[in-house]
Amino acid sequence: MAQKIQSVKGMNDLLPVEQKDFKLTAAFWQAFEDTVGRWTRTYGYQQIRTPIVEQTGLFVRSIGEETDVVGKEMYTFSDSNDSLSLSLRPEGTASCLRAVVEHNLLYNSPQKLWYMGPMFRRERPQKGRYRQFHQVGIEALGFEGPDIDAEIIAMSADLWEKLGIREYLTLEINSLGNREERAAHRAALVEYLTRYEDKLDEDSKRRLKTNPLRVLDTKNPDLQEICNAAPRLVDYLGEASQNHYARFKAMLDGLGIQYIENPRLVRGLDYYNQTVFEWTTDKLGAQATVCGGGRYDGLIEELGGKPAPSIGFAMGIERLLFLVSEYGSLEVNAAPDVYAMHQGERADLQVMKYAQALRTQGFNVMQHSGYQSLKAQMKKADNSGARFALIVAQDELANGTVTLKDMNGAHGQQTVAAADLTNTLQQWKNA
């Protein structure tokens, strides 16, 4: 027997049934996707789909060459034909904005776009952190005021309500100011951290030289006292940045959205400025961040487009659905409405016709294939979770009748005219 080929470590199959180490099913996932589609439409967002492979330069330019994502985590390879460096996308914003610039989508109006799909990072796999993971992203492009900042946070809070997990999530916010303000803060931060360089761990020493703001994001408990006393970026904000942040907070207050100001919240990608935020939970262990985002007013220009102030966020689907599966609510209906079975050598064709007629009327029908006893077929109908069973027997063909059974018992088992099949099932379903 040939050796089995396993899936790549950290990349999961999505199956109709739960797995030992990955409890999410395809039906649960599909129910979430349906919810997201309805949710985004209510806010006027249109879907965009981009390739999972992009030129590596896109991420170097947008995310930042010195970030952990670009430096250590991307799957990068050369195209065999022209040695062009390509990468599997590690996040969705850069790809979305590349498409916007390439196709000139902002030529006459702002855009509200959303995406959903797989991302890839070479990380140590653990629950809630995978090498192939999935995100839903929201991008509001060409909007300058703090009102859109507040709106997209209200939008995310609305989704948490729909999923029944709002009480388990905490909103953290901060302002990173503009480029000049960050540069002034960076100089002060480097001077401060250099005094404690001998106490920093190796990762923080590397970040001190490449992206000192990320030192403040360390999870090392031995460095918390040093980081808490570090210069705060909020103290370097100019009047315009302060006003934007103050108006943003006032809008959250007016919407009744509670938040915590976290001056150490910096996000892991270099393109952010002004407003940044994260939704976190204490229900998922170390993987506390479920959703995060912020402003990236200079990114479209950095990618070759005309300047356009923008803001967005992304949520990790796996983490979010783990939270929903344990604490929230999501209506999942993977079972068929009807399980159609047959007895007799000519009944199989007729049951196929009945099944097709029911599908045209909106019923989900699973049709039995093969020839088994009625008892065996009924067992499969029960295992399928179908609400109703349709039985077509050989002796019913001549008199134009069928047998219907309500698997929940409410209507029992009845023989009805084939012409009344659809109406009867509709009445039972709506009762």
Swiss-Prot record:
SUPFAM superfamilies, alphabetized: Class II aaRS ABD-related, Class II aaRS and biotin synthetases
Q: Does the keyword Thylakoid apply?
A: no
> Which EC class does it fall in?
ligase
Q: Keywords in alphabetical order, please.
A: Aminoacyl-tRNA synthetase, ATP-binding, Cytoplasm, Ligase, Nucleotide-binding, Protein biosynthesis
Give this protein's Gene Ontology molecular function annotations: ATP binding; histidine-tRNA ligase activity
Statement: the UniProt record of this protein carries the keyword Metal-binding: no
> Which Gene Ontology cellular component annotation is one that this UniProt entry carries?
cytoplasm
Name any Gene Ontology BP term.
histidyl-tRNA aminoacylation
Principal place of residence: cytoplasm
Q: Which family does it belong to?
A: Belongs to the class-II aminoacyl-tRNA synthetase family.
Q: How does it assemble?
A: Homodimer.
Q: What is this protein called in UniProt?
A: Histidine--tRNA ligase
Q: Give the organism's phylogenetic lineage.
A: Bacteria, Pseudomonadati, Pseudomonadota, Betaproteobacteria, Neisseriales
